[in-house]
UniProtKB/Swiss-Prot annotation:
Enzyme class: ligase
GO CC terms in record: cytoplasm; peptidoglycan-based cell wall; plasma membrane
Subunit structure: Homodimer.
Family: Belongs to the class-II aminoacyl-tRNA synthetase family.
GO molecular function terms attached to this record: ATP binding; histidine-tRNA ligase activity
Known catalytic reactions: tRNA(His) + L-histidine + ATP = L-histidyl-tRNA(His) + AMP + diphosphate + H(+)
Localization, UniProt: Cytoplasm
Statement: the UniProt record of this protein carries the keyword Repeat: no
SUPFAM superfamilies found in the cross-reference section: Class II aaRS ABD-related (SSF52954), Class II aaRS and biotin synthetases (SSF55681)
Protein name: Histidine--tRNA ligase
CDD domains per record: HisRS-like_core, HisRS_anticodon
EC number: 6.1.1.21
Length: 423
Protein backbone atom coordinates (compact mmCIF):
# COMPACT_ATOMS: atom_id res chain seq x y z
CA UNK A 1 0.00 0.00 0.00
CA UNK A 2 1.44 3.35 -1.05
CA UNK A 3 1.79 5.97 1.67
CA UNK A 4 1.45 9.64 0.80
CA UNK A 5 2.97 12.48 2.77
CA UNK A 6 0.66 15.18 4.08
CA UNK A 7 0.81 18.83 3.04
CA UNK A 8 1.10 22.05 4.99
CA UNK A 9 0.31 25.62 3.98
CA UNK A 10 3.27 27.44 2.39
CA UNK A 11 5.55 29.23 4.85
CA UNK A 12 4.21 32.60 5.89
CA UNK A 13 0.68 31.95 4.59
CA UNK A 14 -1.96 31.72 7.35
CA UNK A 15 -5.07 29.56 7.37
CA UNK A 16 -8.21 30.86 9.07
CA UNK A 17 -10.22 27.86 10.22
CA UNK A 18 -13.25 27.68 12.55
CA UNK A 19 -13.72 29.14 15.08
CA UNK A 20 -11.03 31.78 14.30
CA UNK A 21 -12.41 32.31 10.80
CA UNK A 22 -15.53 33.91 12.31
CA UNK A 23 -13.42 36.70 13.77
CA UNK A 24 -11.54 37.15 10.49
CA UNK A 25 -14.83 37.56 8.58
CA UNK A 26 -16.22 39.96 11.20
CA UNK A 27 -13.12 42.16 11.03
CA UNK A 28 -13.04 42.23 7.23
CA UNK A 29 -16.76 42.94 6.93
CA UNK A 30 -16.70 45.53 9.72
CA UNK A 31 -13.91 47.51 8.06
CA UNK A 32 -15.70 47.33 4.70
CA UNK A 33 -19.02 48.41 6.22
CA UNK A 34 -17.53 51.71 7.38
CA UNK A 35 -16.57 52.50 3.76
CA UNK A 36 -19.92 51.48 2.32
CA UNK A 37 -21.72 53.71 4.79
CA UNK A 38 -19.77 56.62 3.31
CA UNK A 39 -20.89 55.86 -0.26
CA UNK A 40 -17.94 53.79 -1.47
CA UNK A 41 -18.79 51.17 -4.13
CA UNK A 42 -17.18 47.73 -4.22
CA UNK A 43 -14.57 46.92 -6.86
CA UNK A 44 -13.15 43.45 -7.52
CA UNK A 45 -9.67 43.30 -9.06
CA UNK A 46 -7.37 40.63 -10.53
CA UNK A 47 -5.02 38.83 -8.16
CA UNK A 48 -2.18 39.35 -10.65
CA UNK A 49 -1.32 42.25 -12.96
CA UNK A 50 1.30 43.28 -15.50
CA UNK A 51 4.57 43.64 -13.57
CA UNK A 52 5.19 47.05 -15.16
CA UNK A 53 2.09 48.42 -13.42
CA UNK A 54 3.70 48.03 -10.01
CA UNK A 55 7.21 48.95 -11.16
CA UNK A 56 5.94 52.25 -12.52
CA UNK A 57 3.22 52.92 -9.98
CA UNK A 58 4.73 51.76 -6.68
CA UNK A 59 8.32 52.71 -7.55
CA UNK A 60 11.29 50.61 -8.61
CA UNK A 61 13.41 51.85 -5.70
CA UNK A 62 10.95 50.63 -3.06
CA UNK A 63 11.55 47.44 -1.11
CA UNK A 64 8.14 46.25 -2.32
CA UNK A 65 9.21 46.25 -5.98
CA UNK A 66 12.91 45.50 -5.62
CA UNK A 67 12.72 42.73 -2.99
CA UNK A 68 9.20 41.60 -2.09
CA UNK A 69 7.10 40.98 -5.22
CA UNK A 70 6.06 37.54 -6.46
CA UNK A 71 6.90 37.92 -10.15
CA UNK A 72 6.94 35.22 -12.81
CA UNK A 73 6.60 34.70 -16.56
CA UNK A 74 3.33 33.13 -17.67
CA UNK A 75 2.99 30.61 -20.50
CA UNK A 76 2.90 33.48 -22.98
CA UNK A 77 6.23 34.74 -21.59
CA UNK A 78 4.55 37.83 -20.14
CA UNK A 79 5.87 39.11 -16.82
CA UNK A 80 3.07 39.14 -14.25
CA UNK A 81 3.08 39.84 -10.52
CA UNK A 82 0.81 38.80 -7.67
CA UNK A 83 -0.54 42.12 -6.43
CA UNK A 84 1.52 43.50 -3.51
CA UNK A 85 -0.91 46.38 -2.87
CA UNK A 86 -4.26 47.65 -4.10
CA UNK A 87 -3.99 51.26 -5.21
CA UNK A 88 -2.15 50.76 -8.50
CA UNK A 89 -4.67 48.14 -9.63
CA UNK A 90 -7.62 50.35 -8.71
CA UNK A 91 -6.16 53.30 -10.63
CA UNK A 92 -5.53 51.05 -13.63
CA UNK A 93 -9.16 49.88 -13.54
CA UNK A 94 -10.47 53.44 -13.19
CA UNK A 95 -8.52 54.47 -16.30
CA UNK A 96 -9.32 51.34 -18.31
CA UNK A 97 -13.07 51.49 -17.66
CA UNK A 98 -13.41 55.27 -17.88
CA UNK A 99 -14.73 55.70 -14.36
CA UNK A 100 -12.90 59.02 -14.20
CA UNK A 101 -15.14 60.34 -17.00
CA UNK A 102 -18.18 60.32 -14.74
CA UNK A 103 -19.04 62.01 -11.46
CA UNK A 104 -16.04 62.78 -9.26
CA UNK A 105 -14.70 61.71 -6.90
CA UNK A 106 -14.78 58.05 -7.84
CA UNK A 107 -15.21 56.27 -4.49
CA UNK A 108 -14.24 52.60 -4.39
CA UNK A 109 -13.62 49.96 -1.71
CA UNK A 110 -12.19 46.45 -1.90
CA UNK A 111 -10.99 43.51 0.16
CA UNK A 112 -8.82 40.51 -0.53
CA UNK A 113 -5.37 38.91 -0.43
CA UNK A 114 -2.12 40.66 -1.34
CA UNK A 115 1.31 39.11 -1.62
CA UNK A 116 4.79 40.12 -0.47
CA UNK A 117 7.84 37.94 -0.03
CA UNK A 118 8.92 38.94 3.46
CA UNK A 119 10.44 37.15 6.43
CA UNK A 120 7.39 35.58 8.11
CA UNK A 121 6.68 36.64 11.68
CA UNK A 122 3.67 37.46 13.80
CA UNK A 123 1.55 39.95 11.89
CA UNK A 124 3.75 39.91 8.79
CA UNK A 125 2.67 37.33 6.26
CA UNK A 126 3.50 36.53 2.66
CA UNK A 127 -0.20 36.47 1.90
CA UNK A 128 -1.81 39.36 3.74
CA UNK A 129 -5.47 40.26 3.83
CA UNK A 130 -6.45 43.90 3.43
CA UNK A 131 -9.45 46.18 3.16
CA UNK A 132 -8.89 49.32 1.13
CA UNK A 133 -10.63 52.45 -0.12
CA UNK A 134 -9.69 54.89 -2.87
CA UNK A 135 -11.28 58.29 -3.62
CA UNK A 136 -10.08 59.57 -6.99
CA UNK A 137 -10.62 62.82 -8.84
CA UNK A 138 -10.81 65.62 -6.24
CA UNK A 139 -7.95 67.42 -4.47
CA UNK A 140 -9.76 68.44 -1.31
CA UNK A 141 -8.34 68.18 2.23
CA UNK A 142 -11.88 67.48 3.48
CA UNK A 143 -11.81 64.27 1.43
CA UNK A 144 -8.50 63.31 3.06
CA UNK A 145 -10.16 63.72 6.45
CA UNK A 146 -13.18 61.66 5.37
CA UNK A 147 -10.97 58.77 4.26
CA UNK A 148 -9.03 58.83 7.53
CA UNK A 149 -12.26 59.03 9.53
CA UNK A 150 -13.63 55.97 7.71
CA UNK A 151 -10.62 53.91 8.81
CA UNK A 152 -10.90 55.23 12.36
CA UNK A 153 -14.62 54.39 12.45
CA UNK A 154 -13.96 50.91 11.07
CA UNK A 155 -11.52 50.07 13.85
CA UNK A 156 -13.79 51.50 16.54
CA UNK A 157 -16.82 49.59 15.23
CA UNK A 158 -14.94 46.39 16.07
CA UNK A 159 -14.34 47.50 19.65
CA UNK A 160 -10.64 48.24 19.06
CA UNK A 161 -9.47 51.24 21.08
CA UNK A 162 -5.76 50.77 21.80
CA UNK A 163 -4.60 52.27 18.51
CA UNK A 164 -3.45 55.72 17.48
CA UNK A 165 -3.40 57.66 14.22
CA UNK A 166 -0.04 59.11 13.18
CA UNK A 167 -0.11 61.68 10.39
CA UNK A 168 2.25 63.90 8.41
CA UNK A 169 2.59 65.68 5.09
CA UNK A 170 5.02 64.55 2.40
CA UNK A 171 4.76 67.86 0.56
CA UNK A 172 4.06 68.51 -3.12
CA UNK A 173 5.96 68.96 -6.38
CA UNK A 174 6.90 72.54 -5.49
CA UNK A 175 8.75 71.72 -2.26
CA UNK A 176 9.87 68.10 -2.54
CA UNK A 177 12.72 68.72 -5.04
CA UNK A 178 14.37 71.25 -2.71
CA UNK A 179 13.88 68.97 0.27
CA UNK A 180 15.27 66.05 -1.72
CA UNK A 181 18.49 67.99 -2.37
CA UNK A 182 18.72 69.00 1.28
CA UNK A 183 18.21 65.41 2.45
CA UNK A 184 20.70 64.01 -0.05
CA UNK A 185 23.29 66.52 1.10
CA UNK A 186 22.76 65.32 4.67
CA UNK A 187 22.84 61.61 3.75
CA UNK A 188 25.94 61.84 1.56
CA UNK A 189 27.73 63.35 4.55
CA UNK A 190 27.18 60.10 6.49
CA UNK A 191 29.29 56.95 6.43
CA UNK A 192 26.78 54.89 4.42
CA UNK A 193 27.32 51.48 2.89
CA UNK A 194 27.36 51.29 -0.90
CA UNK A 195 23.80 50.02 -1.32
CA UNK A 196 22.33 52.63 1.03
CA UNK A 197 24.27 55.38 -0.74
CA UNK A 198 22.87 54.13 -4.06
CA UNK A 199 19.32 54.26 -2.69
CA UNK A 200 19.94 57.76 -1.35
CA UNK A 201 20.81 58.83 -4.88
CA UNK A 202 17.60 57.34 -6.32
CA UNK A 203 15.10 58.24 -3.60
CA UNK A 204 16.52 59.54 -0.31
CA UNK A 205 13.19 59.12 1.50
CA UNK A 206 13.67 55.36 1.18
CA UNK A 207 16.71 55.66 3.45
CA UNK A 208 14.61 57.24 6.20
CA UNK A 209 12.26 54.25 5.89
CA UNK A 210 15.10 51.79 6.60
CA UNK A 211 14.42 49.76 9.76
CA UNK A 212 18.06 49.00 10.69
CA UNK A 213 18.70 50.47 14.17
CA UNK A 214 22.18 51.72 13.32
CA UNK A 215 20.92 53.59 10.25
CA UNK A 216 17.95 55.01 12.12
CA UNK A 217 20.36 56.39 14.70
CA UNK A 218 22.50 57.96 11.96
CA UNK A 219 19.48 59.65 10.36
CA UNK A 220 17.86 60.83 13.61
CA UNK A 221 19.00 64.41 12.94
CA UNK A 222 18.05 64.42 9.25
CA UNK A 223 16.06 67.44 8.02
CA UNK A 224 12.29 67.02 8.36
CA UNK A 225 9.99 67.55 5.38
CA UNK A 226 7.30 69.15 7.56
CA UNK A 227 9.72 72.04 8.15
CA UNK A 228 10.07 72.64 4.40
CA UNK A 229 6.49 72.49 3.08
CA UNK A 230 5.27 74.88 0.42
CA UNK A 231 2.52 77.30 1.40
CA UNK A 232 0.00 75.21 -0.58
CA UNK A 233 1.07 71.93 1.04
CA UNK A 234 1.08 73.48 4.51
CA UNK A 235 -2.40 74.94 4.02
CA UNK A 236 -3.64 71.54 2.80
CA UNK A 237 -2.18 69.78 5.85
CA UNK A 238 -3.53 72.35 8.31
CA UNK A 239 -7.01 72.00 6.78
CA UNK A 240 -6.88 68.20 7.05
CA UNK A 241 -6.03 68.51 10.75
CA UNK A 242 -8.83 71.04 11.29
CA UNK A 243 -11.34 68.64 9.73
CA UNK A 244 -10.07 65.74 11.86
CA UNK A 245 -10.49 67.92 14.95
CA UNK A 246 -14.06 68.73 13.91
CA UNK A 247 -14.80 65.04 13.27
CA UNK A 248 -13.42 64.05 16.67
CA UNK A 249 -10.66 61.87 15.22
CA UNK A 250 -7.59 62.00 17.51
CA UNK A 251 -4.14 62.04 15.91
CA UNK A 252 -0.44 62.47 16.60
CA UNK A 253 1.74 64.38 14.15
CA UNK A 254 4.76 62.25 13.23
CA UNK A 255 7.19 64.41 11.22
CA UNK A 256 9.51 61.45 10.56
CA UNK A 257 6.92 59.18 8.98
CA UNK A 258 7.85 57.80 5.56
CA UNK A 259 5.39 55.61 3.67
CA UNK A 260 6.83 52.57 1.89
CA UNK A 261 5.37 53.42 -1.54
CA UNK A 262 6.68 56.16 -3.84
CA UNK A 263 3.37 57.55 -5.07
CA UNK A 264 2.36 59.35 -1.86
CA UNK A 265 2.17 63.18 -1.77
CA UNK A 266 0.84 65.63 0.80
CA UNK A 267 -1.19 63.75 3.44
CA UNK A 268 0.28 60.47 4.70
CA UNK A 269 -0.95 58.54 7.72
CA UNK A 270 -0.62 55.29 9.62
CA UNK A 271 -2.65 53.55 12.32
CA UNK A 272 -0.46 51.80 14.87
CA UNK A 273 -1.15 49.50 17.81
CA UNK A 274 1.57 48.99 20.40
CA UNK A 275 0.16 45.61 21.38
CA UNK A 276 1.68 44.12 18.23
CA UNK A 277 5.32 44.79 19.09
CA UNK A 278 7.65 45.63 16.21
CA UNK A 279 4.93 45.06 13.60
CA UNK A 280 2.74 47.79 15.07
CA UNK A 281 1.13 49.11 11.90
CA UNK A 282 -2.47 47.99 11.36
CA UNK A 283 -3.18 50.20 8.36
CA UNK A 284 -2.25 53.35 6.56
CA UNK A 285 -2.43 55.37 3.40
CA UNK A 286 -2.21 58.81 1.92
CA UNK A 287 -2.74 61.10 -1.04
CA UNK A 288 -1.30 60.29 -4.48
CA UNK A 289 -1.67 63.32 -6.74
CA UNK A 290 0.48 62.13 -9.65
CA UNK A 291 -0.32 58.42 -9.89
CA UNK A 292 -3.25 58.62 -12.35
CA UNK A 293 -1.18 60.58 -14.87
CA UNK A 294 1.85 58.37 -14.26
CA UNK A 295 -0.20 55.29 -15.21
CA UNK A 296 -1.54 56.85 -18.42
CA UNK A 297 -4.72 58.54 -17.23
CA UNK A 298 -5.90 62.06 -16.58
CA UNK A 299 -3.93 64.22 -14.18
CA UNK A 300 -6.31 63.59 -11.27
CA UNK A 301 -5.52 63.33 -7.58
CA UNK A 302 -6.44 60.51 -5.23
CA UNK A 303 -6.46 59.50 -1.59
CA UNK A 304 -6.81 56.05 -0.06
CA UNK A 305 -5.78 53.50 2.54
CA UNK A 306 -5.12 49.82 3.11
CA UNK A 307 -6.06 48.26 6.46
CA UNK A 308 -4.58 44.95 7.55
CA UNK A 309 -7.26 42.41 8.44
CA UNK A 310 -4.68 39.96 9.83
CA UNK A 311 -3.09 42.58 12.06
CA UNK A 312 -6.43 43.93 13.23
CA UNK A 313 -7.37 40.42 14.35
CA UNK A 314 -4.09 40.24 16.29
CA UNK A 315 -4.67 43.71 17.77
CA UNK A 316 -8.09 42.66 19.04
CA UNK A 317 -6.56 39.56 20.62
CA UNK A 318 -3.88 41.73 22.25
CA UNK A 319 -6.71 43.69 23.89
CA UNK A 320 -8.43 40.46 24.95
CA UNK A 321 -11.35 41.11 22.62
CA UNK A 322 -13.12 39.18 19.90
CA UNK A 323 -15.26 40.22 16.98
CA UNK A 324 -18.00 38.20 15.37
CA UNK A 325 -20.10 35.25 16.46
CA UNK A 326 -18.14 32.01 16.74
CA UNK A 327 -21.38 30.00 16.83
CA UNK A 328 -21.77 27.94 13.68
CA UNK A 329 -25.56 28.05 13.80
CA UNK A 330 -28.56 29.27 15.76
CA UNK A 331 -30.56 26.03 15.65
CA UNK A 332 -29.38 22.42 15.64
CA UNK A 333 -31.72 19.66 14.49
CA UNK A 334 -31.54 16.23 16.15
CA UNK A 335 -33.51 13.65 14.14
CA UNK A 336 -33.94 10.21 15.70
CA UNK A 337 -35.08 8.09 12.78
CA UNK A 338 -35.44 8.29 9.02
CA UNK A 339 -38.88 9.94 9.01
CA UNK A 340 -37.63 12.51 11.53
CA UNK A 341 -34.54 13.17 9.43
CA UNK A 342 -36.69 14.01 6.40
CA UNK A 343 -39.10 16.21 8.34
CA UNK A 344 -36.40 18.15 10.17
CA UNK A 345 -34.64 18.75 6.86
CA UNK A 346 -37.84 20.39 5.58
CA UNK A 347 -38.11 22.49 8.76
CA UNK A 348 -34.45 23.47 8.44
CA UNK A 349 -35.15 24.77 4.94
CA UNK A 350 -38.04 26.90 6.17
CA UNK A 351 -35.98 28.34 9.02
CA UNK A 352 -33.06 29.12 6.71
CA UNK A 353 -35.45 30.92 4.36
CA UNK A 354 -36.47 33.03 7.37
CA UNK A 355 -32.83 33.99 7.99
CA UNK A 356 -32.05 31.48 10.74
CA UNK A 357 -28.79 29.52 10.66
CA UNK A 358 -29.61 25.82 10.98
CA UNK A 359 -27.47 22.68 11.07
CA UNK A 360 -28.54 19.05 11.41
CA UNK A 361 -27.04 15.95 13.01
CA UNK A 362 -26.07 13.46 10.31
CA UNK A 363 -25.15 9.82 10.73
CA UNK A 364 -26.36 7.54 13.48
CA UNK A 365 -24.99 9.37 16.53
CA UNK A 366 -27.82 8.59 18.92
CA UNK A 367 -29.42 11.17 21.18
CA UNK A 368 -26.41 11.77 23.46
CA UNK A 369 -23.95 12.12 20.59
CA UNK A 370 -26.26 14.42 18.66
CA UNK A 371 -26.84 16.65 21.70
CA UNK A 372 -23.09 16.91 22.28
CA UNK A 373 -22.77 18.05 18.67
CA UNK A 374 -25.54 20.59 19.27
CA UNK A 375 -23.65 22.01 22.26
CA UNK A 376 -20.40 22.26 20.27
CA UNK A 377 -22.16 24.07 17.42
CA UNK A 378 -22.95 27.07 19.60
CA UNK A 379 -26.65 26.85 18.76
CA UNK A 380 -29.15 28.36 21.18
CA UNK A 381 -32.00 26.03 20.26
CA UNK A 382 -32.21 22.32 19.46
CA UNK A 383 -35.05 20.66 17.57
CA UNK A 384 -35.43 17.03 18.69
CA UNK A 385 -37.82 14.57 17.05
CA UNK A 386 -38.18 10.82 16.66
CA UNK A 387 -40.37 9.00 14.16
CA UNK A 388 -43.21 8.77 16.72
CA UNK A 389 -43.08 12.55 17.22
CA UNK A 390 -43.37 12.99 13.47
CA UNK A 391 -46.43 10.72 13.42
CA UNK A 392 -47.95 12.87 16.17
CA UNK A 393 -47.07 16.05 14.28
CA UNK A 394 -44.84 17.49 17.03
CA UNK A 395 -41.22 18.51 17.60
CA UNK A 396 -39.40 19.11 20.90
CA UNK A 397 -37.92 22.63 21.02
CA UNK A 398 -35.12 22.77 23.60
CA UNK A 399 -33.46 25.96 24.82
CA UNK A 400 -29.78 24.98 25.07
CA UNK A 401 -29.04 27.89 27.42
CA UNK A 402 -31.71 27.22 30.07
CA UNK A 403 -32.44 23.57 29.36
CA UNK A 404 -36.17 24.31 29.02
CA UNK A 405 -37.94 22.02 26.55
CA UNK A 406 -41.45 22.27 25.09
CA UNK A 407 -43.37 20.17 22.59
CA UNK A 408 -44.59 22.24 19.63
CA UNK A 409 -46.82 21.36 16.70
CA UNK A 410 -45.06 21.07 13.36
CA UNK A 411 -46.83 24.14 11.97
CA UNK A 412 -45.73 26.28 14.91
CA UNK A 413 -42.02 25.37 14.98
CA UNK A 414 -40.74 28.24 12.82
CA UNK A 415 -42.64 30.89 14.81
CA UNK A 416 -41.59 29.33 18.14
CA UNK A 417 -37.91 29.24 17.18
CA UNK A 418 -37.87 32.81 15.86
CA UNK A 419 -39.58 34.00 19.05
CA UNK A 420 -37.00 32.26 21.26
CA UNK A 421 -34.06 33.60 19.27
CA UNK A 422 -35.46 37.12 19.48
CA UNK A 423 -35.93 36.87 23.25
Amino acid sequence: MTEFSSFSAPKGVPDYVPPDSAQFVAVRDGLLAAARQAGYSHIELPIFEDTALFARGVGESTDVVSKEMYTFADRGDRSVTLRPEGTAGVVRAVIEHGLDRGALPVKLCYAGPFFRYERPQAGRYRQLQQVGVEAIGVDDPALDAEVIAIADAGFRSLGLDGFRLEITSLGDESCRPQYRELLQEFLFGLDLDEDTRRRAGINPLRVLDDKRPELRAMTASAPVLLDHLSDVAKQHFDTVLAHLDALGVPYVINPRMVRGLDYYTKTAFEFVHDGLGAQSGIGGGGRYDGLMHQLGGQDLSGIGFGLGVDRTVLALRAEGKTAGDSARCDVFGVPLGEAAKLRLAVLAGRLRAAGVRVDLAYGDRGLKGAMRAAARSGARVALVAGDRDIEAGTVAVKDLTTGEQVSVSMDSVVAEVISRLAG
